[in-house]
Each structure stands twice: as C-alpha cells, then as structure tokens.
A protein has these predicted regions:
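Glycine/proline-enriched, intrinsically flexible loops and inter-domain linkers
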Residues: 1-292
C-alpha cells in the first residue's frame, strides 16, 4: 500500500508498506508451490486506488475481499498497513513543516550519498577480479522431483564497482519456484553485499540501508531463468533460491575476504500451510508456519 505525500500542494513522495497477509486468493489456501502461473497464485491488481480523495472505492474494496478466503484477517491487515502509511505521511509532513522541504529532502539525498560512499570505499579494498562460487544446487521445482536446479554465481569487482552475475543458472520452471528479479533477487544481492562489507554489528560506523547502497550493486540474471522469469511464470516459492544466492555470494568472496565471511546456511526454508473451512463463520482459517 502506498499513500502520496503532499506539502503545500506539491507531491514530494510516498509513504509505503509491504506486508504478508494470510491469503491472496489463487488456487490453494495460503501457500501453493505447484502453481502453474501468476493467475493461479493470486488476484492481480496493478496500481488501483483503494481510496481517492479520502473516500473508499467500495467496488474495488468488495472485489479485493471477495477474492480471498480470510476476509476478516485480510481486512484488518490492510487497514493496519493503511494506518501505518498515514502515520508515516503525517510525520514526514510534520518534519518538512518544521525544517522545510529543501532541508529534509537534501538531507535524505545526502544520507543516500553517504551510504554509497561508505560502500564504495569497502568495495575498493577488494582486489579487482572475478570471484566464482562453486555451482550451487536446489533440490527440485516442487513438481519434477528428479530434476535438480543449477545456481551459478560470479562476483566481479572492478575499482569501487561490484557486479553479481547469475548467468548459467537453471531455466525458468513451470511451478511457483521462480524468483522475481526486482522484488526478490535484487534484494538478496543487496543484502549479501551489505552483510559482508557493512555489517551492522561489526562495522565500526553506522551506515543506513537505503538506495545509496542499492544503486551500487549491479545484478545480471538472463531473462528466462529461475532468477528472471518471463511473465506470467509463478513466483510464490522463491525463498530457498534467494538464500542460495546469498550463500554463493559469500562463498565467492570468502577467499578475498576470509575475515568478513561466514559459513553458509542450508539455503532451506520450511514453510507449512494449514487450512480448513469454518462453517459457523463462513470463512477459511489458515495458519502459516515458517522455519529457517
């Protein structure tokens, strides 16, 4: 959910919240690793106005909640997300009114530039070169149990630039075991680089996580692979793959940075979904359990 922020009539940004909800519609309650495409995963909404000028769009509201199994829970969650956005908007407006828009926005840009400078300084300490991890593997795509999925990872360092290249990884699959490039893969790459070079606990200075860090890390994943699938491939079960990428980045840089890298994890996440229908309420109950 995103709420626009205006100060003195000028649009200066958004307050936004991303969160998990119990059910998003689709062909199966809660979790569906075996979904054939995005349409089997959920109802798709592209930038629609739930509220406009403070007034609820009742038709859209009805469509959203008529297409999920847990209406009561989802309605509460979405209203909480909206309230968080409104609070963020109000506080940002108050900040701008206190210090002026110019001061607040210039400070925000400087904050991002600071993070970029700090990360570039750490990247520059790594000897130039291409660091390649051994091939990583994922068990299967949740349907074709005898087909393992290849994960290739190379990290190139050149001056204060860094590129993570997944060329050679497994082709996209006909289940939910693909990874959205922008929404999941990039985040994993940013996390891997930050946790090695600017660890929040061990690094001596506080460096905020923001776009200044994100804009430095280049990521290559050829279209049509599990890390950059074509529309409308399903992407619900994307977790183990992104963890494997993080492990591979750490492994690739371990020789150059032995004191800043750790042993990897199992690149596994156990995600169980339980559900049933309550006749007395006329709604599903859904319980999700996540263990890493």
């Amino acid at each position: 959910i995103a709420v626009p922020i205006f100060v003195s009539g000028d649009h200066i940004g958004f307050a936004a919240v991303t969160a998990h909800v119990l059910d998003v519609g689709g062909s199966f309650p809660g979790l569906n690793a075996d979904a054939f495409d995005m349409y089997a995963e959920a109802k798709i909404y592209n930038g629609l106005r739930w509220y406009e000028q403070g007034k609820l769009n009742e038709d859209l509201d009805r469509m959203i909640f008529d297409n999920v199994r847990t209406e009561t829970m989802n309605r509460g969650d979405l209203n909480a997300m909206l309230a968080a956005c409104e609070l963020g908007k109000d506080r940002f407006v108050a900040l701008c009114e206190r210090y002026s828009v110019d001061v607040v926005m210039s400070s925000a840009y400087e904050w991002m530039d600071y993070s970029e400078r700090m990360l570039r300084a750490e990247i520059k300490k790594i000897p130039d070169g291409v660091y390649k991890a051994p091939t990583g593997w994922l068990d299967d795509d949740a349907r074709n149990r005898d087909v393992r999925l290849r994960v290739e990872t190379a990290v190139e360092v050149k001056g204060d630039d860094i590129t993570i290249d997944l060329t050679g990884s497994h082709p996209e699959v006909p289940t939910g075991y693909n990874v959205p490039f922008e929404g999941s893969l990039l985040v994993s790459a940013y996390y891997a680089v930050r946790t090695i070079l600017l660890d929040e606990v061990t690094f001596p200075e506080s460096v905020p996580q923001n776009d200044g860090i994100f804009r430095i890390v280049d990521v290559i994943a050829p279209k049509g692979t599990i890390f950059n699938p074509n529309f409308p491939r399903a992407c619900f079960s994307r977790f183990c793959q992104t963890q494997r990428v993080v492990d591979n980045v750490i492994l690739a840089l371990s020789e150059a940075l032995p004191e800043q890298t750790t042993a990897g994890n199992a690149a596994g996440i156990h995600f169980c979904s339980y559900s049933g229908f309550q006749e007395e309420t006329g709604q599903y109950w859904i319980y999700l359990e996540v263990n890493e």
